Design a protein with these regions (language model features):
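Positively charged n-region of N-terminal signal peptides that target proteins for export
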Residues: 1-7, 520
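Bacterial N-terminal signal peptides
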Residues: 6-17
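Noncatalytic, solvent-exposed loop/strand surfaces
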Residues: 19-520
Length: 520
């Protein structure tokens, strides 16, 4: 009898483990984008020097701003080409790597030439900054050139699937590569042309297989700035994504004021189906950084989006069957001015002003129980120091800038993070070297902690812990509770931009140079 009970208990434990051990195929939890995972049995600490709790380590480039995602036995992350894995890919490139989840072996990579007509369109050495979204055997990504690509999860090793077959030309540097012009000089977006000698890089088994490609510059009319930073949201047959439309190299001019900030593509073909119609682009202070989220509010599905103009929007998703050849306009449900007292006209004259400027939003809007949690404020490089964490009532409609605010909590200085909302608590880190825990219901501060370094990553809650890396290379693990408790502080010696990801009882931590798989 005791053996039978033990067997049943063991079976129950295995089932429970299987329930919480799962892939993490996109940035943030499900559609809500909350930085919270149901994973269990995760390590509290690790040590790369001694190997404690280290499952494997993979070498990356020298700049890694992309967060790892895990799906179907593979780990995906973007980096640069300063540590090339294939000698045919030389020089500055954006690189997107696919590793074996079991052992960290490189399975394939997408290596894309940088834009050359203007350094501010594809910043040198920045690499591939966007985070992938995976569904089945397809990987969706915005690459460093500002193109949305759909990739075969198995790479070219199983053949070149279509309809896109021109990988050789896409991996080869264009002939019209030129030095970056002086600020203010008129430049035009380059197109990819074969080199004059006709020699194309021949892709091999280690290269990516592009299934389709949508060029945001040529086909959506955007002007990219600094780097494409996006995380594609999948809803049914559609892809929702921010375009990275921004200022030019003067930081005082929008070259594409009529371009969309939020678009919808067909996930099977890459065809443009819909865009926003809110004139967002003309008032973008720096760039369109924030990816969209989605939730059901009172039985109604909504797309939430933070524009580069500092406005938080809710849109209705488009219908299942979009009209052929007609780009729809997304229907707005509400708008919320995140910083109503900020300048609204001639906004770029405030560029570089640390006391007064518009606000923008880098992190994603997080939906939990009819409320949106958004962090934003003055731009890290060009704006004022002020920043806030705000809670918005997502059940309202129209202009809810006044009546939609539930609470506002001041942060120390600038903010790049997406909030993590767990068990009635909100965790957020800012660039003023402070980590915050506040009440989700009213924004009441519970505790703060002085940390070493600015934070570009987001806090990540899993297994009763909060994981957080900083730009100084320090890595923290806090207890996810109302009373402050620091469980671990490590010095990883290399800056961290990426958010931690938990999947299948493993946490994945990316520094600028290495990807660690950590298992208890």
């Amino acid at each position: 009898m005791s053996q039978k009970i033990s067997a049943l208990t063991l079976c129950g434990c295995l089932v429970a483990t299987a329930v919480v051990a799962a892939d993490q195929p996109q940035f943030g939890a499900a559609w809500s984008r909350n930085m919270v995972s149901d994973e269990r049995r995760l390590p509290e600490t690790f040590n790369p020097q001694t190997g404690q709790n280290i499952k494997w380590v993979a070498k990356l480039g020298t700049q890694t701003h992309s967060t790892p995602v895990i799906a179907n036995g593979r780990v995906y992350i973007g980096t640069n080409n300063d540590e090339p894995r294939d000698p045919k890919h030389e020089g500055d490139r954006g690189v997107f790597m696919c590793f074996d989840e079991k052992n960290g072996q490189l399975l394939w990579q997408l290596v894309v030439p940088k834009r050359h007509e203007d350094a501010y369109m594809d910043w040198p050495k920045m690499g591939m900054s966007s985070t992938a979204t995976v569904e089945g055997d397809r990987v969706y990504l915005v690459d460093n050139r500002g193109a949305v690509v759909c990739l075969d999860a198995k790479g070219l090793a199983n053949g070149n699937d279509g309809p896109f077959r021109d990988e050789a030309a896409y991996l080869t540097s264009p002939t019209n590569a030129t030095a970056s012009p002086r600020p203010g000089a008129e430049t035009k977006p380059e197109s990819l042309h074969p080199p004059a000698d006709g020699k194309l890089l021949q892709p091999g088994a280690l290269d990516a297989d592009i299934l389709w490609r949508f060029d945001l510059v040529a086909e959506a009319g955007i002007w990219p700035h600094d780097a494409a930073h996006s995380s594609i949201l999948i809803h049914g047959n559609h892809l929702y994504l921010n375009t990275a439309n921004g200022v030019d190299n003067t930081h005082k001019r929008i070259r594409a004021p009529d371009a969309p900030s939020l678009i919808v593509l067909d996930k099977t073909t890459g065809r443009l189906l819909a865009r926003d119609d809110e004139n967002i682009a003309s008032n973008v202070f720096h760039n369109t950084w924030a990816a969209p989220s989605l939730a059901k509010v009172n039985g109604r599905t909504l797309i939430f989006f933070c524009g580069g103009n500092g406005i938080v929007y809710a849109f209705e998703p488009i219908g299942r069957n979009a009209p052929t050849g007609e780009v729809q306009k997304l229907k707005k449900v509400f708008q919320f001015d995140f910083d109503p007292s900020a300048p609204k006209t001639e906004i770029h004259k405030f560029s570089g002003n640390r006391r007064e400027s518009p606000s923008n939003i880098y992190g994603m809007p997080v939906f939990v129980r009819d409320r949106l949690y958004v962090a934003g404020g003055g731009d890290l490089w060009w704006g004022k120091n002020e920043a806030w964490l705000k809670c918005i009532d997502a059940t309202q409609t129209g202009d809810i800038s006044t009546n939609g605010l539930v609470w506002s909590y001041p942060l120390e200085k600038h903010v790049m993070s997406t909030p993590a909302v767990s068990d009635g608590l909100v965790f957020i880190a800012d660039c003023g070297r402070k980590f915050h825990c506040v009440e989700a219901k009213n924004g009441k501060p519970l505790w703060t902690h002085e940390i070493k370094g600015e934070v570009w990553a987001s806090p990540y809650v899993a297994d009763g812990k909060v994981y957080l890396g900083t730009r100084s290379g320090n890595f923290y693990v806090f207890a996810a509770q109302r009373e402050k408790k620091v469980l671990t502080e490590l010095d990883l010696r290399t800056p961290i931009s990426a958010t931690v990801t938990a999947a299948n009882n493993v946490i994945f931590v990316a520094t600028m140079t290495h990807l660690y798989a950590i298992k208890r």
